[in-house]
């Protein structure tokens, strides 16, 4: 969103100097320096920093002679919600034979929700392994084929099969596609009726170490304020380390290394683990207008 605003601001400078209408790099850099300064406090929605940002953008629009597009305003109000998660200390996983283990937060797993509620979670949700959690018809790929994940917790590998195999003929090889993104995987799991999804973290495939999702999960989540959120947002989203995922699958009698390798082959089918997981997340919820 800020990139679009910066582009608009730079174009304003072009309009203001119509004798040389080329896109001015110096103006773009100037606006970046201003908006990224400490004075704008991070520009988060619903904060004083956002108000300063909006005032600056509006000032630049007026200086360029642009006409307001929404009545006498340049701005459109958007209802948003800020959700600050406070996850339980552990996810409790139990097998069919009574074998249990704990996957602890934040060293093994991190979770959050975009449901604007004081608390949510899963209880005795069946754990399902879904390969990369991808449905990509143009690549002839469907990790959910024949797999019922309704009301269940899905485990899915980060990135896509092309990266794992380095095969340029599989997806786009080393270059990650949209299907490799974690937010896509959450959306796909939701479309299939899952209660939650944990992305299995691997530093090279993700492009960043575990510290990134671990630290990110302790920060507020911002989302549009929507109706029918239970149908439009997972109860739980999050990440799990490779080691923790391996322990869960091992408790189910499954070999994670073998599963991971098989997941990159065309025609792979996910599987139910027979394990059941419980975990909850408590939230501080604040509604705002951005």
Task: Tell where the protein language model's regions lie, with residue ranges.
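Bacterial N-terminal signal peptides
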Residues: 3-14
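NTP/phosphate- and nucleic-acid-binding module
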Residues: 20, 180-181, 277-279
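Active-site-adjacent bridging/hinge elements
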Residues: 28-32, 163-165, 265-271
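Noncatalytic luminal/extracellular "stalk/propeptide" segments of secretory-pathway proteins
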Residues: 41-168, 273-276, 280-290
